[in-house]
Amino acid sequence: MKKIRKGDSVVLLTGRDKGKQGIVTAVLENKLVIEGVNIYKKSVKPNPAAGVTGGIIDKTMPVHISNVALVDGNGKPSRVGIKLVDGKKQRFLKTTGATLSA
C-alpha cells in the first residue's frame, strides 16, 4: 500500500520549492507530480503533424517521494503509518492519529 496517493495534500520538505504545498496529480514509481510545484521551462520543437506549436512551455516535473510529507489538519507536515482495521489496511497520520480515506 502506497503511503501517498493521488489527491493527497502534501508539502515539499527539500529543494528550491521547500515549504510549498500542493495536491498530488500523479504517482509514478517513487516520484510524485504535484500541482504548482517544481515547475521548469522546457523548449518544444514545432510539430505540425501533431498540431504542436514550438516555443517555451512550463512543465511540472516529478519530485521524489522522500522529499514530501502529507499535510495534517493543522497545516503541518506529518508522516503516514499503516494499521489494520477489521482486516483491512488503513492509512493514518502519525502526528494527530487521524485516519485517512482509503
Swiss-Prot record:
UniProt cross-references to Pfam families, sorted A to Z: KOW (PF00467), ribosomal_L24 (PF17136)
Family, similarity comment: Belongs to the universal ribosomal protein uL24 family.
GO MF term set: rRNA binding; structural constituent of ribosome
GO biological process: translation
Name this polypeptide is given: Large ribosomal subunit protein uL24
UniProt-listed InterPro entries: KOW, Rib_uL2_dom2, Ribosomal_uL24, Ribosomal_uL24_KOW, Translation_prot_SH3-like_sf
Gene Ontology cellular-component annotations: ribonucleoprotein complex; ribosome
Higher taxonomy: Bacteria, Pseudomonadati, Pseudomonadota, Betaproteobacteria, Burkholderiales
Subunit structure, as described in the record: Part of the 50S ribosomal subunit.
Keywords, in A-Z order: Ribonucleoprotein, Ribosomal protein, RNA-binding, rRNA-binding
Role noted for this protein: One of two assembly initiator proteins, it binds directly to the 5'-end of the 23S rRNA, where it nucleates assembly of the 50S subunit.
Domain of life: Bacteria
